[in-house]
Amino acid sequence: MSAAAVAERLEWSTGKLTRSERNEWKFPKRTDVEALLDLYEVEGEDRAHLLSLTEESRGRSDWHQYADLFPGALPDLEAEAVRIRSYESLLIPGLLQTPAYATAIFESSQVVPPEDTQRKVDSRMARRGVLDAPGGPQFICVIDEAALRRVVGSRKVMTEQLRFLIGMAAHYKVTILVLPFEAGAHTAMDGAFALLEFPSPEPGIVSISTGVESLYVEDEAYVDRHRLIFDAVHNLALDPKKSLDLIESIAADYDKRA
């Protein structure tokens, strides 16, 4: 059976199938492994052994206990990526949010039941572990100045959040850039997105969150357009030092007015 036929039968992308065949999925989902075993009619001790290895692998990652909260298995994709480039227009990127900031976001949501808020926050904090994982991705984010100045929760929450960003900028895998208001109109004004890039020659994926669901697009032309869009906002953004200086200035203003 050809790779294309297998991907079609499983309703997987070709990139996902390629990663599984090369054993490059770092945290395989049990349901995905079971689907492959069913397709290839693997039974008995071999099946039990492979499922046992799957559970051992999953047990090493804190966020898998929250797998039901991530449509499209975003943490799996982040873990398999070699680089994530993100543009955020209104919010601090999820990978860089503090618990208090994330709590304020979920508490303001009309679609997250109050009883689910803490688990949502915990899942977001667990997801950050990908940045410290061996072989984890490089994370480059461009944050619109509007996201820094929008008060989420309170000024105290924002002070803590922005100071946390400054601390995370020292992480060797993290680059934080600010797109200032003075940059004016730009090509990414339609909204936020993340570009996940995998080992060559696998295609990249564009992730877009609508607030209700996450969309994942592998279409090559679509991904290429978003590479150009990211490059454009990256070129308009302040350099890392000026970005951190602006973040610190805004944090100091919040702190003074808290």
Question: What name fits each language-model region?
Answer:
Residues G135, V152-A258:
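C-terminal regulatory/effector modules of DNA-binding transcriptional regulators
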Residues S2, T31-D32, E160, F164:
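Short Gly/charged-rich anion-binding patches and loops
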Residues A4-R9, R22, K26-R149, A232-A258:
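Interdomain hinge/linker segments and adjacent boundary elements that couple functional modules
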